[in-house]
């Protein structure tokens, strides 16, 4: 090992006020700049002892990597782009938090944008991320077609679809088994004695289609026929996607004959609107109508009627997406597309407990 050189503290003297450079760290510790660089990039051929020593010394000297210079040398920006349809939705916020935690320790930063469920805005955000030369993109897409993803592929940027996929598009995907979500929720309502089960479905995405299919399969398996008037769609933009959409959809269902005695909602915000409509109509939850949502949002336990919900494990989705993104960056050649499915879990609360 090289002997440390420099001033009394071992650090090579440099102009006062100037930032500490990688080669200063290397000379200070008697290591090569290649070793320091490998530590910064998380290379596996560096021992854990050396990695900890280097990182500790960097922290002591307040070393900040020159990301622009590194990008010119490596062709990488150490950034990952995340496009979600709704920044305020807790499900996507929790995914973003888990992704950020998963990549932070490897020296990567997360750039988050929102499409507001607008395909045109999503395309603009993707173009902005391409212009920023992110190393990987994670996308919970609002698109109706795969054209935007062809554009990403042409640029040679790896991407991962989160929560929503496209049939016929060979891509990386991390999400929940949405058909299982629909089956778990519907079977639970049947087990609670519900026979007229309605479904408030989401917009035309793989997520909504999967949950609708699971709802239908669960009914068919128990020899119950889904009634068209018991399947109500919410709007695809604006407030229609959340509580207001759930409220209006439930008002329609309350006028149906026969009236539903159980409602499976596409997500928890819709379920909140559904419960408000039921209570405003002077009906009881779950005695008159049982309600199940999806997402298991943090406030579900603290509602006037605690909400039964299917937990999608957003933290696991974010962690898996982060790990997959880092592996795509490290790969010397593009690997075959990977699909990771998280198993949903039912969290039973008062809104559905009739037995």
Language model: regions and residue ranges:
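Amphipathic helical "hinge" segments at domain boundaries
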Residues: 48, 61-136, 216, 227
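N-terminal helix-turn-helix DNA-binding module of bacterial transcription factors
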Residues: 1-78, 353-354
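Short beta-strand scaffold positions
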Residues: 26, 139, 262-266
